[in-house]
Design a protein with these regions (language model features):
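Active-site beta-loop-alpha junctions enriched in small/polar residues
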Residues: 15-17, 50-51, 92-96, 122-124, ...
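Non-catalytic positions within long, well-ordered alpha-helices that form the structural scaffold/packing
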Residues: 38, 138, 195-196
Length: 275
């Protein structure tokens, strides 16, 4: 791996396979989306079209859906490789857990040929039994990454559920846009709380490849820099996502404590004086 590769921003969550979900509709939008990501400094991309886990219960329907995905992916990969030869462009899936007992053995459901799988639950609502599902997936040999937990409606204000997810070996992926209010105040607040606990393992764009949509990468990085989060940026945007490409577990991310306020510095000074 070259020095440039080691510093390359990597993204694990986007929708750039043309015409298969609510992301890029055409090959032109795929190429435009990749170009916009490279302009933001992203050089490693695992794009993740939606697929419902319930399809794995119906072999014929699953095969038809994956054949459709494979054909569109082949066209996208050829075009991206030709136009952006320096981009490491791979495919996974964002798996919708619409059943409690999914079979995710098919390697195409994993992120870029790794053992990691990107997961979400339907309609941004959490059903009962999410911990049990994650345990079963872990026992089956997959490494679950929960996509954008901050976006779930009324989600886990006490963070007890996140604690359980992490205890059973799940990882968490936060959207850049959440840090700047893209999904509302509640999602933004929870996003920063999770960073403050050190419980986020990856940042990703969740970019849907449409011309009117933004990446929010630069805006989010600026906010993190303002919060003294340079180490977190490096781990969440570069180091840990790159480790997925090598099928390696993420490194621990320290809690984001933010800049010390004037009041905090004053209290520290007074305590020193008293001591």
């Amino acid at each position: 791996m070259t020095a440039d590769d080691q510093l390359a921003v990597a993204d694990l969550h986007s929708h750039l396979v043309p015409g298969v979900d609510d992301g890029a509709r055409t090959l032109e939008e795929t190429l435009d989306g990749v170009e916009r990501m490279t302009q933001a400094g992203i050089r490693k991309i695992i794009t993740t079209p939606h697929v419902d886990a319930s399809l794995t219960r119906e072999p014929a329907a699953f095969s038809e859906r994956m054949d459709e995905m494979d054909d569109a992916w082949a066209r996208a990969l050829e075009a991206v490789t030709e136009r952006f030869p320096d981009v490491d462009f791979r495919r996974g899936q964002e798996v919708m857990l619409d059943v409690p007992d999914p079979n995710l053995a098919d390697e195409r459901l994993r992120l870029g040929g790794s053992s990691f799988v990107l997961l979400e639950w339907p309609r941004l609502q959490l059903p009962p039994g999410t911990v049990d599902v994650l345990v079963r997936l872990r026992r089956a040999g997959t490494r679950p990454i929960v996509a954008h937990p901050e976006r779930y409606v009324g989600f886990d204000h006490g963070l007890e559920l996140v604690t359980e997810w992490r205890r059973v070996g799940a990882y968490l992926q936060l959207n850049y846009g959440s840090l700047v209010g893209r999904y509302g105040v509640e999602a933004r607040t929870l996003a920063w709380r999770l960073l403050g606990r050190g419980w986020i393992d990856y940042l990703a764009t969740d970019f849907h490849g449409r011309p009117h949509l933004k990446l929010f990468w630069r805006e989010a990085v600026q906010k993190l820099e303002e919060a003294a989060g340079e180490e977190q940026i490096s781990l969440l945007s570069v180091t840990n996502p790159q480790r997925v490409f090598r099928d390696e577990e993420p490194l621990p991310v320290p809690p984001l404590l933010g800049k010390r306020t004037l009041w905090t510095r004053l209290r520290e000074f007074l305590n020193l004086e008293q001591n």
